[in-house]
Amino acid sequence: MDSKLQLFAKVLLKEHYDEFLEMIQLFNIDKRTFVLQHRKMFEKGWYDTSSEDNEFSEVDIMLCFAIVSHRMAVIDWSGEEYSGQVKRSITMMLKNYGIERFLWNTKKFEDSLDWDKIRRGDYLPLLFQAMNKQLNRGGYSIVFCDTKSDCFRYAILPTAEFVQFENTELDDYLTIISPKIYNIYLADKGNELPKIMLYLKKKFSVPLSEIKEFCSRDKILLGIGNSI
């Protein structure tokens, strides 16, 4: 097993880690049989086991096992199936850290939304960011396991543990990222470049070194995305 995957799985799965290692051993002995025997686990992780063309990896095993162990959850990019779905799943994950009850305070965030401008797929990134800010105050962080698919796979880690893995790539397939969003709109640098850079730093909390690199390019692609 890749050393980075091993370290992250140990931090993510905690007391379930040894069981995960046993599953990996069985998977590597006979992958086809393993997938057939654990079809429900893969389905809960939103993996299609019906096609023989699908090749699963140790990273896939970790993601699916984390979900059935309530260490991770998955949701479609377009939005919640029911109101409060994300809060409920994160509240469940916090119980792994002995937090039986977490008082969410997202009313200010909800009231600030202009629903006439919120398009399909816009709400979840904003919700994750608002919830992450509240969790950060208690020493925890939302962690995205980004597989470049049309869903969010998210977990909760103590912030001190998460920072060790932020922006780490596993198996050239999964990237561990935060839900922080940068919204940068820059049409014309003109003669006001220092003021623009200062504004971006204060407005969006983007590191100045990143802003300088961004503004130094001859051609700039603008958009909304995650922190990497």
Regions found by a protein language model. Name each.
Residues A9-K10, R153-Y154, I184-K189:
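A short, ordered amphipathic alpha-helix with a cationic face
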